[in-house]
Every structure is written in structure tokens, then in C-alpha cells.
Amino acid sequence: METQLYIGIMSGTSMDGADAVLIRMDGGKWLGAEGHAFTPYPDRLRRKLLDLQDTGTDELHRSRMLSQELSRLYAQTVGELLNKQNLAPSDITALGCHGQTVRHAPEHGYSVQLADLPLLAELTQIFTVGDFRSRDLAAGGQGAPLVPAFHEALFRDDRETRAVLNIGGIANISVLPPDAPAFGFDTGPGNMLMDAWMQAHWQLPYDKNGAKAAQGNILPQLLDRLLAHPYFAQPHPKSTGRELFALNWLETYLDGGENRYDVLRTLSRFTAQTVFDAVSHAAADARQMYICGGGIRNPVLMADLAECFGTRVSLHSTAELNLDPQWVEAAAFAWMAACWVNRIPGSPHKATGASKPCILGAGYYY
């Protein structure tokens, strides 16, 4: 039997742009990732998406128009990837598209990801799978995180418990025991608060190389107040997003006189400390943690993680397991599309709390 090619598209809570990754499968067996393309969000698009995070007028119309705009950008990204790899749409078995999350409310049984999936199928001329979270929510799950099943398929070791940390806008961990099902949950903010602080105080999308945070000092009292949020004491399964940890939440803990560099530095330690606390509680026997996502490019955050974990847990990039840390999430949704095509349940129900494993997503022919 010939192997199959799939493409995954991911745009996360950082809202910086869309990643597309090409993977090769043999039925349900992973063979590797072969290519990547990235399209940054124009500032105007990003602002409109952020505006939709809060309740406002004409939300239905705005969400549908943004779904179409996003799908055109996704199609452009897929086209660039195909050109890079010298492939035609007919070479691709399926396209897995996560969409752009604008609301995540598992307590109400829904999570909203913007994407016009039929339009994306039409524009790319590729069979498209999307709306991955709804099936898990229908089975009583949180709808997030979905990546632990993918991490388990690729990164599990039969000899030891491993942890996989994804640092996007939200940080989440997957715990991969050698002899039990994988599980995971959102640990709390990843880059999201740091990015929001950068945008508010420097008009920059993020802290490149941690350069601004490196000039600040940790504010212990502020850190303690942030760590007291009740989310961190909740048992897993659990998931979160901008609904809980937005800039206006942070500002309720500030008196206005703080040095902006110090607040940014404190937010880095806040992310690292919440990750450490989560891993210490849920994966006390893990000695190796593999890191992916945009946060791995922030040396201040990586130093904070190293300081929190000390010699207890060894920190690595997923590149050491043959998958670029910037490719992991998009590759996961390509893998989920392959699961859909092969009728394989791809949901990490032990992570989300769903009542059973489910085949995730809905498919659209062009």
C-alpha cells in the first residue's frame, strides 16, 4: 500500500499566524514530517480576532466574515507549502484544520474555532477535516487539550514516564506513562500574558529573545497573587483560555506604579512556576520533559523553567525526538485528519474527561 500525505493547519491562542505542516502516514502509522509553511496574521486581522474575544455587537456576522478571511489565509499557506514541496493538491489525502479559537466554554459544552471549512476545501481542492473539538465536548469532555493522543503516538517511551510541554498562548502538558493511557491538561498562561503586556506597553507582538524581560526583576508579591488564582488548584481534566487569563485580569493585581520590565519578568516566572507545579503534581515520576511551541524561543522563559525544575527533570526540545518544536501542533492536526480518514479514535479522553474515545472532526469534500 502506498503511503499518504496529510497537511495540518494550526493557528493558536497567540494569534500570530497560521502554520501548515506536511506529514507522511502509512494508514494510522506516523512516518514523519516533511515540510512547513507559515503565514503571519496582518495586524488588522489580529485586531479583529481579538475584538471578537469579548462580547459585542454584530458578533455572528463578524465571526462568519472572519471565518472566510481566515480560510483564505489558510488556503494561501497550504498553497505555499505545496509549492515548496513540489506537490499538487491531488497528492494530499486530507487537510486537517483546527481554526482560530475565539471562545472556549467547556462548562457550557462549546468551543468556537473560526474557519469556513467548505470554503477551505473549495479553495485548496483538498478534502478537509475540521471542527475537532465538538465531538469530544459532546462526549462530556473539555474539548482540550487534544494533542496528548498525538504526543502519545509519537513520543511515548516504554521504559519511563515522559512529559511533553507545549508553550503557545496557553501552556499545556501531556503526561505519557509507559504502561497507562496518556493524559494532560492546560497548566495556565503560556506566552499569552507576556504577549499582551508587550503589545500594551511596547506596541510589539512579543518579547523577541526575551530581551525586555531580561531587563526586569521578579516581583515576589505580584507573583504570589497571580499564583493564587483558583484555576491552579482545580483537579484535571481542565482547560482554559483568554476567558480567564486576559490582560484585564492581570491589571486587577497592579497598582499602576510597577516597572513594566519587572511585570514582564514576573509573567515569565509565572508561566514557568505554574508549569512546574502542574508537572510536580501530575507527573511526579517524570524525569524527561520535551518542549514545543513558540515559548521555546524565549531564553528567559527557558531559564525560568530550568531554575524551577533544577536537576529533578531534564528539559529537551522535541527536535531531539525528530519533530521541530514549531511544527508539533500543526502536525498534530494533520495526524488527526489521518485518524478521521482511517476511522481511528484520536481523542485523548483521559486528558479531556470525555466518556469514551471518539473519532474527532467533520469532513468536507471539494
Swiss-Prot record:
Under Pfam families, the record lists:
AnmK (PF03702)
Q: Which GO terms describe its molecular function?
A: ATP binding; kinase activity; phosphotransferase activity, alcohol group as acceptor
Tree of life domain: Bacteria
Q: Which residues bind ATP?
A: G12, T13, S14, M15, D16, G17, A18, D19
Q: What is its EC number?
A: 2.7.1.170
Annotated keywords: ATP-binding, Carbohydrate metabolism, Kinase, Nucleotide-binding, Transferase
Q: Name one GO biological process term.
A: 1,6-anhydro-N-acetyl-beta-muramic acid catabolic process
Q: Which NCBIfam families match?
A: PRK09585.1-3 (NF007139)
Q: Which family does it belong to?
A: Belongs to the anhydro-N-acetylmuramic acid kinase family.
The free-text function statement in the UniProt record for this protein reads: Catalyzes the specific phosphorylation of 1,6-anhydro-N-acetylmuramic acid (anhMurNAc) with the simultaneous cleavage of the 1,6-anhydro ring, generating MurNAc-6-P. Is required for the utilization of anhMurNAc either imported from the medium or derived from its own cell wall murein, and thus plays a role in cell wall recycling.
> What is this protein called in UniProt?
Anhydro-N-acetylmuramic acid kinase
What gene is it encoded by?
Answer: anmK
